[in-house]
Amino acid sequence: MSRPKPIHNAQPEQVFIESLDTEGRGIARVEGKVLFVDGALPGERVWARRTQNHKSFDRAELLQVDKASSLRVSPPCPHFGVCGGCSLQHLEPAAQVAIKQRQLEDHLWRIGKVRPERVLPPIHGPSLGYRSKARLSVRTPKTRGAMVGFRERNSSYVVDMGQCLTLDPRVGQRILSLRTLIGQMQSPQDFPQIEVAATPDAVALVFRHMRPLAESDLQHLRAFGEQHDLQIWLQPRGPETLYPLWPEQPEPLHYDLPDYRLRLRFDPLVFTQVNQAANQVMVRRAMALLQPQPGEHILDLFCGLGNFTLPIARLGAQVLGIEGDARLVALAAENAAANGLADKARYAVADLTQARMEDFAPAGAIDKMLIDPPRSGAIEVLRSLTPGVRRLVYVSCNPATLARDAEYLVHERGYRLRAAGVVNMFPHTAHVESIALFER
């Protein structure tokens, strides 16, 4: 791929915005070439200036909105437009969801040549203060004090921010305090990032550090944790070196799925859904689509901690969860035992980009399946789909790979796309999470 060429001293031009791309940028067409305009909305006529030239498209900065969309709103965050954490705060929240639903359906048809028989109502959660997981960057420029937050849009610089409205407020309202804390360290440049993991009962901050810490640094960190009622964890090298600093024996982090009388424990660095309110509704939706029954044998691929495995087991089915991360599998097994479901839920470690279904599920042994793959999708394991799987629920974080996999399932394996809809897991961002039901 050729590198973009910067455009200097381009003249402003008036353009009409047709739609949004998958990163939340406005799309215009000028003399047959696509122009991406940050901050512009569909239906708007704007003045823009080109900043980058690519072979098939150009990028532009928004200068002025001549005709504003009726869906344009004032962003609640003063850092919007600079911060790369959000891209859609200027769009009315209900319209954000409608655009994501349209993008999902467009991808399914354009890439997969398939349309859902039923469009599911969107799943919502809170739009502010919802982020329970995040990675905050840390920088210490010579001209300013320590910077803590998200990176600037299209840049490696960290935003000069004092708060974050989408983060859990126990962290989002303490950005300035975190900046002060980093500034007190003997070598603040040795802290590249802070991981956030929040639950209703506790918040853990994981400080990644490049060199051994001085005793004064440890004292500052302990005092910060005690003052703000936060768990402080340290990670000197890889994830396996993670350990708690304050308190020395913290209460385990957990989240609940009350509909299924479940409590799932986890470590601060492992994957959990970022929006727990939306996750609870998504799990409920997945169970309604999958309809686990006692006596059925169900496969849960990319199972993680057991977010779907354990509800399936609670509803009476026998379920096998497969995951590539051995630490997640160990936690999932612990969660099954802690919830009294060790006889219903079993787990195994496998690289699902390489494994075949018959490696862990003989032909005819599986009645239904749920998959929750990463952005790359699940085409490798789907190609080895064994006969007998009559119902498949697909939870996706990338509509493009969902559409690709849907094309294979529908046009080559004889499934029907019974239903599909979006999950607004990341409000104010262009991220499209979705859930789909396939049957044959």
Swiss-Prot record:
Q: Which residues bind S-adenosyl-L-methionine?
A: 273, 302, 307, 323, 351, 372
EC assignment: the record states 2.1.1.190
Where do the annotations place [4Fe-4S] cluster binding? 77, 83, 86, 164
Reactions the enzyme catalyzes: uridine(1939) in 23S rRNA + S-adenosyl-L-methionine = 5-methyluridine(1939) in 23S rRNA + S-adenosyl-L-homocysteine + H(+)
Indicate the transmembrane segments per the record: none
Could you cite one Gene Ontology molecular function of this protein?
Answer: iron ion binding
The GO biological-process annotations, alphabetized, read as: rRNA base methylation
Active site location: 397 (nucleophile)
* Major enzyme class: transferase
Question: In what residue span(s) does the TRAM domain sit?
Answer: 6-64
* Annotated family: Belongs to the class I-like SAM-binding methyltransferase superfamily. RNA M5U methyltransferase family. RlmD subfamily.
Q: What is this protein called?
A: 23S rRNA (uracil(1939)-C(5))-methyltransferase RlmD
Native organism: Acidithiobacillus ferrooxidans (strain ATCC 23270 / DSM 14882 / CIP 104768 / NCIMB 8455)
